[in-house]
Amino acid sequence: MSSSVRLLLIVALLYTNSWAKTVKETLRITWEEGAPNGQARELIYTNGQFPGPPLIWDEGDDVEVTVWNEMAKNVTVHWHGLDQKDSPWSDGTPGLSQRPIQPGQSFVYKFKASPPGNHWYHSHEKMSLVDGLYGAIHIRPKEDRTGLWSQISQDKEDIKAMEKAARDPEYLVVSDWSQYTSEEYWKMSTDSGLLVFCLDSILVNGKGEVYCPGQEFLQKELAPGLVQDAFPPGTEVSDKGCFPADLDQVQGGPWNITKRPDLIPPRVQEGCVASKHENETIVVDPHRNNGWVSMHIVAAATIAQIAFSVDSHEFWLYEIDGNYVNPKKFVSAVMSAGETFSIMMKLDQEPGRYTMRVPNSGASQVLGAFAEMVYEGHERAEKSGRAYLSYGGNPTSPDVEKNSFFPWQLDTDHMSPWPANKPRPGKADEEHLLVLGRVGAPYKYTMNTKYLYPVDFQNNDPLLFYPDATCGTENDGLVLRTKNGSWVDLILQVSTLPGDTSSFEHFMHKHGSKTWRIGFGTGVWNYTSVEEAIQERPQDFNLETPGLRDTWITAFSIGGEAYWSVFRYYVDNPGPWLFHCHIELHLMGGMGIAILDGVDAWPEHIPEEYRLD
């Protein structure tokens, strides 16, 4: 071999290894007492911290994460937003890709770090997300994104600075929090016959407080029009900002069960007890990266819909669910449970301390929360700046509302992918109508009219290894099957089931692939095909610039009006993927379905280490 050829081979090998290094991580999951909001309870720690540590990789890395379960209960870890191409056994979903990790046991997840962007990891065993197993993931892209940043600024120095800032973001894991564990919380609903969803705090990076501003203040903080449109006249929230637990507008029905609100433990719905604790502080340097800072925000909420703003600071939203979007400038944004946002902010205000506001903006509860953004060197400055959001998540002025991102409003939620990426037009190869709602009780949920997805569905015989296990059984109603290389439309109908005509929003997440939302409208879906609906209601569809995400809000039906959404995706990732609501109470109640994508190209060469006995 000539020296020149040898040199070329060495260079090629070095280049390949620079993008395909093996990264090994270890996560030790423990169950310990903590007090993230100043009030003690038991929770999940990851490597001795809560939330778990951010995991930072480069696009294309071969990742190996060993998870040790040192708790007395089962666990799995799902890598939310990662496509798991050619590694469906590492998705972390019990009953689909693996058996749960038993106490004292370990499991090694192996996958490619893909796609680039900001994602997160979390537990997927029952409702244990409520207990604190979650953390941020950042996959740095191979290529720079000059074309993305040039939409924000044409200045070459700004473009370089934004690229650097995006590769080293601040991480904000925003979660809701209750004084009760997930098992205790679920027991409240089954004992009382009511869906209970009152919280104590919202945390930023595991830090927060319990605020008790008083019932009169909270009543004034209700979203304008909410009580008038959705609840009986005179409805009042409690001193925790919660609606009465037994309201028909909240619980639906009538159901053939006995409602026992007296079995809801004290201090869940009312009886606020304040606790002073520590709020998160993010220190930023206006002299670094030409004054640009990027923030990776994870909505690790289990119930709440999180709003976000920083006093006096505008920001550019440039990434949703790990997918780059054509940037738009806002002063506040609302995130649904399960979503990730990445924002770019110019530190161009008077150096000082500014309040970050992260209230619940949904209709479930009036609940505020705060953190701080501090310009480096001004930690002792007085707080300053204009507030864009109130304690209850309401815009503080009409111009704030005009410049805010609301996922339930299609005119503001028009965040098209960058670079351009649109679905195939015309008729899909497959269509599946899924009817979402409650059946039989306020806390029992379905995605296909009647079947409830059990939390232990196929735990012993995961569908990756036994894809035909449900054939010929009633459980097959919990499974959809698609063919590889096909275009699929998922039609979601909400608020049509008996007793569930005032349905709250659902935050629908699909594992294994992102989907385009190509249509949205009110009423009952009574079309023979999506193609027919497009012809009759072209104003309700967008196949040119639809958003592309893995988590979508279905919207909120006020006054009992039915509505539907259409999501389209391409099947190129064979495997068993869960499609479910990311509100933990809804998933625990049955709102999930298994989609076996590419059954005609099912993974056959499963690594020996993942094969079941």
UniProtKB/Swiss-Prot annotation:
Quick one: which residues bind Cu cation 2? H80, H122, H582
Span of the signal peptide:
1-20
Q: Which GO terms describe its cellular component?
A: cell surface
Domain Plastocyanin-like span(s) in chain numbering: 29-142, 171-359, 468-598
| Cross-referenced Gene3D superfamilies | Cupredoxins - blue copper proteins
Major location (coarse):
other
**What InterPro entries does the entry give?**
Cu-oxidase-like_N, Cu-oxidase_2nd, Cu-oxidase_C, Cu-oxidase_fam, Cu_oxidase_CS, Cu_oxidase_Cu_BS, Cupredoxin
Q: Which GO terms describe its molecular function?
A: copper ion binding; oxidoreductase activity
| Residues of this chain annotated as glycosylated in UniProt | N74, N256, N279, N484, N526
Annotated metabolic or biological route of this protein: Pigment biosynthesis
**Role:** Laccase; part of the Pks1 gene cluster that mediates the biosynthesis of an anthraquinone derivative pigment that contributes to conidial pigmentation that provides protection from UV radiation, heat and cold stress. The polyketide synthase Pks1 produces 1-acetyl-2,4,6,8-tetrahydroxy-9,10-anthraquinone though condensation of acetyl-CoA with malonyl-CoA. The dehydratase EthD and the laccase Mlac1 further convert the anthraquinone derivative into the final conidial pigment.
Name the PANTHER family on file: LACCASE-RELATED, MULTI-COPPER OXIDASE
Regarding protein family, the annotation reads:
Belongs to the multicopper oxidase family.
Query: What is the official name of this protein in its record?
Result: Laccase 1
- Gene name of the record: Mlac1
